[in-house]
Amino acid sequence: FSDGLADAGYVDGENIVIHQLSAAAEASNCPSIADTLINEKSDLILAVATPCASAVKEKTADIPVLFTAVTDPAGSGLVASNDAPGANLTGTSDMNPVAQQIALGKQLIPDAKKVAIMYCSSESNSKIQSDLAEAAIKEQGMESVVKTISAIDEAKSAIESLKGQVDFIYIPTDNTLADGMTTVSAAANECGIPTIVGESGMVGNQLLATASTTTNSAKQRLRWRSSSSRERQSLQACRSNTRQTKVFWRLPSIQKLLTS
């Protein structure tokens, strides 16, 4: 964003001042940050992720607000419509291909019958994805169980409660869980539960995989993070008229896990 402003001739420290504040992965910090930026009489506010955008929306109807990394702006109550936002807010959505991600889980674990959907109960963006995941799981002929947490320190016990109860876990683009993926992946690995996540930035540990979609391609391709050619053979590239799907995964022990 700062680079884009600079390209347009607005350079921090020269003709504009950019004040960056972080909520430090705590949604409860967002309202006070919004107050600070409004009290400074900011000319424009960029809000990253749904909790920040929601906090700013509650505080001002006058200052122009851009948001990004929001799953469903209209569904989260930020705008009247995703096609015509109206009011003082507009921005971009990072909606992930939930149905394709669930299908990926089914491809990796063909015998899967039950899937857990795990997210933080305070994040409306995650609830939207959870509803989509439930529908996708049903369409794949599987059963879903929803497991919510209110803080990352509940993740380990939540995952442990799923051991032996589900065939894999689906985690949407949930800010709380994304920030705590080290804890999540360690617990899932210890319990032997494969985990499908909402975006590639959450893939970095064992038992994690995702699929992401970009436009302007006539062919779907799959990209792997894997140490085994045998594992690579688990997925096949398929074709599409409009989109490119990339699969990011780090599942070095999935074949052993699924047969043990």
Please give the residue ranges for each predicted region:
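Short hydrophobic alpha-helices and adjacent helix-cap/hinge residues
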Residues: 1-260
